[in-house]
Amino acid sequence: MAAGTDIGIDLGTASVLVYVKGKGVVLKEPSVVAFDRNTNKIKAIGEEARLMLGRTPGNIVAVRPLRQGVISDYTVTEKMLSYFIYRTVGKSLFGRKPRISVCVPSGATEVEKKAVEDATYQAGARDVSIIEEPVAAAIGAGIDIAKPCGNMIVDIGGGTADIAVISLGGVVVSNSIKVAGDDFDEAIVRFMRKKHNLLIGERTAEDIKINVGTVYKRPENLTMDVRGRNLVTGLPKTVTVTSEETEEALREPAYQIVDAVHNVLERTPPELAADISDRGIVLTGGGSLIQGLEELIEEKTGINTMTAEDPLTAVAIGTGKYIEYLADDDKKSKNK
């Protein structure tokens, strides 16, 4: 691949997506790193490491270096980024490093933004631009954010839900809460423990969420057999879980997201609120794929709610398009 490539990175709690100018999203891997505790050497990164979660011997640890949208382990994040950048652009020719745009939650502090910026430089970037996730999500969802018109984005990742009203290229009102896809998984783990005396891992909880999970009453009550460890006997056990049960399990995190949407709507200027009422609310991020979320938000707000065409890659695409926008701006400046 050519030197000096421009790339956009959606550095998420659950997964990392990389967008390359002219090629689109070229990499999507879980944000998981496995390393040997004795030697401190990395054993696996991405999908290979994710498959090790909950299944490693004592000396191997599989970790997620990002928590709730921000870096929790700087060194591991830097190594993970280096690996993904190398896989994307290969070895830089003539020492020419890529220019990289990275997104952060809208509620990230200056210190948290600086940590992401520094880690990206250390991982091999020539220049680093930071963009807020809701803005990236809006661009990736095909919204023209430069217009003087209110657009509401609800971006639900693995660690955070970012709700923002965007107009004239910037965020007018926003709210970032640390409730998202991972919290849905944790709610299912707690429910299974309390209701069925069954201990399950996060991968099993995610499978339940994807296959039968819902936050709004489904037309039909789906079922799924779930295997785990009986907390009473300590032996393996299989129970049948229904989508009705998951609605109960997921109610609290789902309503926290709805409340955050309400909070932003209440603080939105009247003219922009009228725009949102006409144009609707757009959902992005992997967490938006939970069954029934569109219907729940629409019912509670009275505003038409829709999921972006490709919610999983919207932030990555928007982050990449943002670096293209900056590149175009540079050209215009040089031509003046």
Language model features with spans:
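Nucleotide/phosphate-binding catalytic cleft detector across ATP-hydrolyzing
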Residues: 1-156, 164-282, 288-336
